[in-house]
């Protein structure tokens, strides 16, 4: 209860600061056209009273003061009420109806038009996870096709930088949706794992691996047997070829030997007998 009361009090303080800055900005925007009209009317009519000019000077505020007030109020509001403090969102202005703006409008009119936009309606939806926990999600409804917005940084004094056009509320809403979906997916996975025991998956995987290794071993054994049979067949064919060649050479050798013997016999028959001197007796000396 104390934290909620503190939260509401801080929210009211930030709202009052914003209202003060809005009044200052509107006074600037209203004073600029009035000053231009007064300058044009002085040429044709008499000058305005000194009291009105003094009141107008008192109502004028410098641009640097307006920037500082807006910057401080926005930073205070974001630091107090941001659901995700780790995301450092910078204060920004978003003009949503810049297509319909007058091209001759000034920067004060742009600020006035951007601050007059209506807040988007929110709704809370309660969903139940499979594990029985109920989750409340805040949904922010906006236009389906928002026009492009001009985003300016207020931390730099006179310069402007272009920032991402994400709204902190929309970012927090998307984070809530993501967390809700992740919790649902985790609950579904846990319920599925509870229904199906993990041991069956391990057994099936082990059986598949054993069957695969057995099939590979059988195929390898068949290939080895086939290669051994092919090598034996090649060796046997080579041996048979050598044996045939040896037999052929042996037969050829026998034929050549017979032919040589025949030639020798024919030569001996054809050669005539030679006359030779023979000693009849020997003398004993």
From Swiss-Prot:
Tissues/organs with expression: Highly expressed in shoot apex.
PTM comment, free text: Phosphorylated at Thr-282 in a calcium-dependent manner by CPK6 and CPK33.
Chain ranges passing through the membrane = none
User: Locations of Polar residues compositional bias?
Assistant: 13-25, 98-107, 272-285
Provide the primary localization.
Answer: nucleus
Q: Where in the cell is it found?
A: Nucleus
Under the heading Pfam families, the entry gives: bZIP_1
Q: Where is this region: Disordered?
A: 1-59, 79-107, 115-134, 198-236, 257-285
* Ranges of biased composition (kind: Low complexity): 26-50
The bZIP domain sits at 214-277
Spell out the molecular function terms from Gene Ontology. DNA binding; DNA-binding transcription factor activity
Region annotated Basic motif sits at 216-235
Which keywords has UniProt assigned to this entry? DNA-binding, Nucleus, Phosphoprotein
Q: Name one GO biological process term.
A: positive regulation of flower development
List the residue ranges of the region (Leucine-zipper): 242-263
For whether the record's keyword set contains Protein biosynthesis, the answer is no
Where composition is biased (Basic residues), the residues are 1-12
**Sites bearing Phosphothreonine, chain numbering:** 282
Gene3D superfamilies, per the entry: 1.20.5.170
Annotated Gene Ontology cellular component terms: nucleus
Q: Is the Cell division keyword given for this protein? A: no
Described function: Transcription factor required for the transition to flowering promoted by FT.
Describe the protein's quaternary organization and the partners it interacts with.
Answer: Self-interacts. Interacts with FT and FDP/BZIP27. Interacts with GRF3 and GRF4, and in a calcium-independent manner, with CPK6 and CPK33.
| Protein family | Belongs to the bZIP family.
Q: What is this protein called?
A: Protein FD
């Amino acid at each position: 209860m104390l934290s909620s009361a503190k939260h509401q009090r801080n929210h009211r303080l930030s709202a009052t600061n914003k209202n003060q800055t809005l009044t200052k900005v509107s006074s600037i925007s209203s004073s600029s056209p009035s000053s231009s009209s007064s300058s044009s009317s002085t040429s044709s009519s008499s000058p305005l009273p000194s009291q009105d000019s003094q009141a107008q000077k008192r109502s004028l505020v410098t641009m640097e003061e307006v920037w500082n007030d807006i910057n401080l109020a926005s930073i205070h509001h974001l630091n107090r009420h941001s659901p995700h403090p780790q995301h450092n969102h910078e204060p920004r202005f978003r003009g949503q109806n810049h297509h319909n703006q007058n091209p001759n409008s000034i920067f004060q009119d742009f600020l006035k038009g951007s601050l007059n936009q209506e807040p988007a309606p929110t709704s809370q939806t309660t969903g139940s996870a499979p594990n029985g926990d109920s989750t409340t999600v805040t949904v922010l409804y906006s236009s389906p096709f928002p026009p492009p917005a001009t985003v300016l940084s207020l931390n730099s004094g006179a310069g402007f930088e272009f920032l991402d056009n994400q709204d902190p509320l929309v970012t927090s809403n998307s984070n809530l949706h993501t967390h809700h979906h992740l919790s649902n997916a985790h609950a579904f996975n846990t319920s599925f794992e509870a229904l199906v025991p993990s041991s069956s998956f391990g057994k099936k995987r082990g059986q598949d691996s054993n069957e695969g290794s057995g099939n590979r071993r059988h195929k390898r054994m068949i290939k080895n047997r086939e290669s051994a049979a092919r090598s034996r067949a090649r060796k046997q064919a080579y041996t048979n070829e050598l044996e045939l060649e040896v037999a052929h050479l042996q037969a050829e050798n026998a034929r050549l030997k017979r032919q040589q013997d025949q030639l020798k016999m024919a030569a001996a028959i054809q050669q005539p007998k030679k006359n030779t001197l023979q000693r009849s007796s020997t003398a004993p000396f």
